[in-house]
């Protein structure tokens, strides 16, 4: 079983970057692009909880992550020369290669002795990335690490994909002798690899002219370069796996999860998360949601909650957090920890801000 505990490491701070452009799902019309013919704006909002999203067809995940990281590093007054690693968790890298983390090392002005690596995960990605960063930091060999996580500029036409929004977050992790650290549980079910996927684009099904031919899928007109999701399969997976993972983590490490201050779940959709809350018998006041204003932001969704929903309550105050990410893969991860985290103000990035675009 994938349970483990990491001590002597802590989260020092969290920040987030989003596009300044806001798209309202109430303004979308049935039949536009991949919007289904029977699309009802109000019904969609009521079903998913997503009213509006931050969208950019220009800015990449690394652009938003760079903005978030710059803000966080400045707020923490970290000397960039002391940052030992940068981890980039995303399914929307700048290029097929090189790794986007390498580009961010240079763009952020980090040392050439810096460890840099990409992690190709989605909804569970922040928890996985956190486990890697904390593992590196716990020994003291790497003392400061920046974890950037998120997705943006997907292959689907952004304004016409009513569920997903663009965002990237930066999390600062450092070595801290004696820190209680983190308790993790992870799982994978690769038999559901096609529950959420882009069929063409990789080396298995390479891009060809036919990749852009529209076909009907789950009531939508789509092409093979867009995200295909088996809605009911994903819903069933989410409402089953997330509660089980939380309970397994608590049972394995012998703690009462009801005593935790905050429960931060991946922001998949409102109905799914409502059922998870009911299954775990949680106080809804302890389970913040950002879907209404930001949609599903993939691996950014958990840390984005800290920035956009509870910053004023938790900033620099010791709190107990239980976080669970679940989705594409199929993959899931849950983490429990207690800490006082500095939470930076949200960074809004304008499409026209040329300083956020990195050109080789």
Label each region the model flagged:
Residues 11-13, 44, 72, 86, ...:
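Buried hydrophobic positions in well-ordered alpha/beta secondary-structure cores of metabolic enzymes
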Residues 83, 142-145, 260, 318:
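Short, high-confidence coil segments that cap the C-terminus of an alpha-helix
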Residues 31-36, 92-103, 268-271:
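A structural motif shared across PLP-dependent enzymes of the aminotransferase-like
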Residues 1-58, 160-236, 240, 244, ...:
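Condensing-enzyme catalytic core mediating Claisen C-C bond formation in acyl metabolism
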Residues 68-84, 244-261, 309-314:
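Phosphate/pyrophosphate-binding loops at sites that engage ATP/ADP/AMP, CoA/4′-phosphopantetheine
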Residues 12-15, 89, 120, 145-151, ...:
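Short beta-strand segments
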Residues 140-169:
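Flexible, glycine-rich active-site loops centered on histidine and acidic residues
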Residues 62, 66-69, 92-93, 106, ...:
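Claisen-condensing/thiolase-fold acyl-transfer catalytic domains that form or cleave C-C bonds
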């Amino acid at each position: 079983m994938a349970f483990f505990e990491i001590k002597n490491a802590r989260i020092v701070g969290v920040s987030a970057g989003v596009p300044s452009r806001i798209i309202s799902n109430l303004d979308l019309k049935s039949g536009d692009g991949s919007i289904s013919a029977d699309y009802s704006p109000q019904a969609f909002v009521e079903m998913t909880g997503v009213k509006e999203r931050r969208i950019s067809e220009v800015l990449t995940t690394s652009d938003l992550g760079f903005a978030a990281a710059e803000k966080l590093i400045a707020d923490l007054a970290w000397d960039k020369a002391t940052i030992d690693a940068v981890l980039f968790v995303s399914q929307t890298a700048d290029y097929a290669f090189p790794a986007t983390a390498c580009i961010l090392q240079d763009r952020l002005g980090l040392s050439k002795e810096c460890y840099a690596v990409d992690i190709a995960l989605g909804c569970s990605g922040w928890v996985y990335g956190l486990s890697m960063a904390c593992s590196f930091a716990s020994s003291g060999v790497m003392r400061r690490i920046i974890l950037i996580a998120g997705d943006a500029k997907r292959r689907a036409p952004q304004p016409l994909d009513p569920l997903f929004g663009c965002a990237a977050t930066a999390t600062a992790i450092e070595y801290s002798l004696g820190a209680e650290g983190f308790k993790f549980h992870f799982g994978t079910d690769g038999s559901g690899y096609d529950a959420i996927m882009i069929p063409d684009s990789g080396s298995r099904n390479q891009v060809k002219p036919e990749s852009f031919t529209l076909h009907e899928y789950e009531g939508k007109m789509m092409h093979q370069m867009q995200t295909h999701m088996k809605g009911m399969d994903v819903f069933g997976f989410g409402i089953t796996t997330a509660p089980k993972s939380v309970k397994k983590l608590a049972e394995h490490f012998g703690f009462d999860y009801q005593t935790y201050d905050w429960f931060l779940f991946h922001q998949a959709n409102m109905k799914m998360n409502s059922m998870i809350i009911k299954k775990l018998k949680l106080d809804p006041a302890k389970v913040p949601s950002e879907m209404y204003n930001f949609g599903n932001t993939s691996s950014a969704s958990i840390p984005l909650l800290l920035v956009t929903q509870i910053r004023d309550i938790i900033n620099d105050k010791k709190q107990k957090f239980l976080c669970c990410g679940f989705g594409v893969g199929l993959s899931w991860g849950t983490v429990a920890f207690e800490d006082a985290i500095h939470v930076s103000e949200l960074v809004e990035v304008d499409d026209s801000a040329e300083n956020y675009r990195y050109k080789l």
